[in-house]
Amino acid sequence: MVRRFKRAVKYRRGSRTHGWGRVGQHRKSGGSGGKGMVGFHKHKWSLVMKYGESGTGWPFYGKHGFKQPQAISIEWRPINVGTLAEVVRGLKREGRVKEEGGRYVVNLVELGFNKLLGGGDVDLPIVVYTPAASRSAVEKIEKAGGEVRIVPAVHR
């Protein structure tokens, strides 16, 4: 990037204060009116009026939200019952799904999902092992002759 001006430091060698007046006037936080957010209700009020929202003073005052720690946040990977029925049909063709008592047994965690939702229709009797399921999904699976079993699982 092209420099548009030469730094004044080069030409101020030996001048002791480099154009900042008395020694100490360019040190610490006194010359700038205080550290950080100091003075926004006093001598820096004009900055609040200029840059803050009218009436609220945002972003200088008030609460500013909350960022949930990653350790407790859950990354949901849902699947609808209609999509699950199609997946089970595909797994049945490949011979990768277990069948017990005329019902297909599916573990959603092994398939990469952790929640069952109620979108779509299901006509296969499926026993689903999942960490979480919606009420409508459970109703649709049971209506088709299947069952939903909630199992504890690590969400991450």
Curated annotation (Swiss-Prot):
What Pfam families does the record tag this protein with? Ribosomal_L27A
Basic residues composition-biased segments: 1-16
Q: Name one GO molecular function term.
A: structural constituent of ribosome
Q: Name one GO cellular component term.
A: cytosolic large ribosomal subunit
Coiled-coil region list: none
Q: How does it assemble?
A: Part of the 50S ribosomal subunit.
Function (record text):
Binds to the 23S rRNA.
Name this polypeptide is given: Large ribosomal subunit protein uL15
Q: Which organism is it from?
A: Pyrobaculum neutrophilum (strain DSM 2338 / JCM 9278 / NBRC 100436 / V24Sta) (Thermoproteus neutrophilus)
